Amino acid sequence: MFNEYFGGGMNGIVFQELRESRGLAYSAFADYSTTKRKEKQTNYAYTYIISQNDKMMDCIRVFNNILDTMPQSQAAFELAQQAAVKRIASQRITKANIIFSYLGNKRIGINYDLRRDIYAAMPKLTLEDIVKFEHDNMANKSWLYIILGDENNLDMKSLEKIAPVKRVATEEIFTF
């Protein structure tokens, strides 16, 4: 539900703020995920923002602001809630995904389809729950940035103010 509201699709807060409201990005997406391990629960968030080089620092500034003070919209929340419920209701686990789903659930100590619990909890969630989750898990945290682009066209001085910059050759990224 959080991903649907925050970063998923064209109605997500990240897309709306960076693309629709401000016109800073061609595309923007964010996701919060957990690993399926009972013994060691690891949570992580990732995003991608595709923009012009000259808008990069504006995108970083706006995205950090979204993370620290997430915009709240009851209308967007209701759309996200409806979309999440419909997605679970229409989603089917088939073919090889049957075993992968079973093994994933087994790793976290359950022997049934976890989506059943999520589906039942969905109507009870409120916008305040989403805001609290975001505040507790994402606001005011340190982030790792990966910037792809021609260094000659990027504002490297501004990037260096955010964090130390590590330059990586194309061959280190694409090893084939």
What is the predicted function of each stretch?
Residues F2-E4, F15-T69, A75-L127, H135, ...:
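M16 family metallopeptidases and their MPP-like homologs
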Residues G8:
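Structured mid-domain segments that build the active-site/substrate or prosthetic-cofactor binding neighborhood
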Residues R22, N65-Q72, E160-E171:
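A common structural junction motif
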Residues F15, L127-F176:
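Proteolytic maturation boundary segments
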